[in-house]
Amino acid sequence: MFDSDVLDRDPGARDNFFAQLSHVAEGEFSAPRHRHDFEQFRFMLEGEARFREGKMVSGVLGYFPEGAYYGPQDRTHGSVLIVQFGGASGNGFVDRKVMKVAMAEMKALNTGVFEDGLYRRNPGVGGKPVQDGNEAIFEYIRKRPVAYPKPQYLCPIMIDSSAIAAFPVEGLEGVEERHLGTFSSTRIRAARYKLEPKASLPVHERGIYWVLSGSGAIDGAPYRRLTALYLEQGEQAAFKAAEASDILYLGLPRLELIRTQEAELPEKAAAAPQNGSPLDEASATAG
């Protein structure tokens, strides 16, 4: 839905991100216990995702901090909104298309096999015999071990958005907000907004706004269920509801609060094909 190609952004920037709507069939996906050097939000639209830390069902938002272990994930089915992004560490987020190219190159080398979210090296090949698949790809791309930051949160946070009270937004008639949380030192915010018919919601925070239900217009352009809007820092827009609307906001880090180190990417990344996901897990729920 959103990546560096769609938005014409630098895939090597420390504020790079990826967003998609994933549909997963019963029994199609599982993942071992692992961690990442980036952060992610997941919002379940329908179905369930079961982790050791808890079960996500419709309306549950998961925040997965950089550096924190989670899983295993042994059951996932349904539809989930996913946003993956570089966190406070400044490690950035390796672009999906870059990972797809790297995975293809690793397969061509025939030094191991990708299986069940893991990379299993052939006997006699240097490196860990068994390694998290994404980690192996990151190390191939960056030509160095993955540097996991010390997690600011020790485990994922799962929020039942329907259990959080909604309050009127001051100065905005017909608009209520459920504040789902503010996370990390980069002040990532998440919220849900309920708009009555004819209500208006001006927005200006960096991040992605997903329409969960309803219809109307964004600055005159029509919106409907699953319309998504991305705002860069400093941009603004306004939702005008034609019918009752439910809008999910998933914020991204404030740029000035990200450590000033650029993600390392190979020069060949610029020529990589679009819309790639490295593992089955990435194309399904990007574990």
Predicted regions and their residues:
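Jelly-roll (double-stranded beta-helix
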Residues: 1-43, 48-287
